[in-house]
Amino acid sequence: MNGNLLEVINRLSSLRPIFNMEADFQFALAWEIQKKFPDWSVRFEKKPPNLKDRIFVDLWIEGDETCAIELKYKTRRFDIDVKGESFNLLNQGAQDLGRYDFLKDVERLENIVSAHDNVKGYAIILTNDSSYWKSTATETIDTKFRIHDGRVLNGELAWRPEASSGTVRGREKPIKLTGTYKLNWKDYSQVSGTSYGKFRYLFLEI
């Protein structure tokens, strides 16, 4: 599925170089997968079998193989008309929480994959916010959760001790990864020459 999914994303980038929101991205990707594989089952917000916890994945696909896909779409404020359609993206901010949530997706997918014999997992984040893919030498409370290009992720990832309880409320637990991931960001689209007109994505196979 890895190669097929990357092929679908590549095609989607020419058809839909920008999305209104995460649900728009989720539906568009599911639609392209269904078009390419019309006999496959594509389901939204599916609870995988064989799990005690109430865990749901963004996309659950059953065909020649079964896979679970988690998606994130993180944006900076950006207004543009593309192919006759107006897009008014919000400035989501809170990049530290965005990184944590993406890595929580990876941890969740690891648990799903380990509970099934023939399931693959894919975590995808698409963004026009370069702070996700660019590295920084500055130490921040979310240093361990950084997902910049070229980084290798594994093991236990936790907030720095000075992180306030208000900032990390609901996300206090460290993330524990059993796999090792070399982060390789890819270009998705360039809808304008402005700072936030470039979209890139990170694709991790679990």
Residue positions per predicted region:
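Nucleic-acid nuclease catalytic cores
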Residues: 110-141
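Well-ordered, non-membrane alpha-helical segments in soluble/globular domains
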Residues: 96-108, 141-146
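Surface-exposed cleft-lining segments at the edges of enzyme active sites
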Residues: 86-100
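N-terminal intrinsically disordered, cationic/polar leader segments
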Residues: 10, 42-43, 47-51, 67, ...
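Conserved catalytic cores of phosphodiester-cleaving nucleases, focusing on short active-site segments
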Residues: 59-61, 65-89, 109
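Interdomain/boundary linker segments immediately adjacent to catalytic/signaling cores
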Residues: 1-36
